[in-house]
Amino acid sequence: MNTEGFPRDSETEMKHLTEMILKGDEEQAARSAEELSRERTEVNDLVDAISDAMNIVADLHEVDRYSVEQVERCEKAAERALTALRPKIRVEQTRISGRVMVASLKDDPHSFDKTLLMAMLEIGGFTPLDGGSDMSPQEIVQKVDELDPDILAVPLVTESAAKNLLETSHLISSNRIKPHIVAYGRGAASLSPQEGFGTVEEDSISALSRIAELLISKN
């Protein structure tokens, strides 16, 4: 409910959700997400709105408008909003077997896209493996050795992180365990599958679909 005591319409509430994430207000972000989802049977467009808000946060961080601490507060608010929406997130259920490790790299200001994909994998019937956040290429390879995944999914927000993924791919190419790498997110736009590391997808939803396809073909 707004300050005038009247309920907001959907468009206004959507803007409010974005504002609360940008302010890093966990309670208000969760409350806004709950309000928006109340009359809906599916909320994938709201998940997109949360992702868009975190892209704005990344932009503000890149131009030094947001500190690391502010980004962390925004990420926590986005995660609370995602938790509120989770019961109504709809993805295709699957019984496909396979090990999917999700990890984010250094030089990305946040790892919300990692959190989102892991949630969607769980909802879809997978058991995702947490490969860590803010990882160096060497740390990713160590995690690959430890967890032995079939697929390594890496969200990318910035081009700097994309460069780290290329280094990671190079290290993995000479490694004993060689998972198929799926890069996704706006930072992946600078990459090409022809560079030898696997697959490039636009967002978490398309990454999830590609992961399912890859595991089906493997099985």
Question: Each predicted region: which residue ranges?
Answer:
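Long amphipathic alpha-helical segments
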Residues: M1-Q93
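CheY-like receiver
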Residues: S32, K143-L147, R210-L214
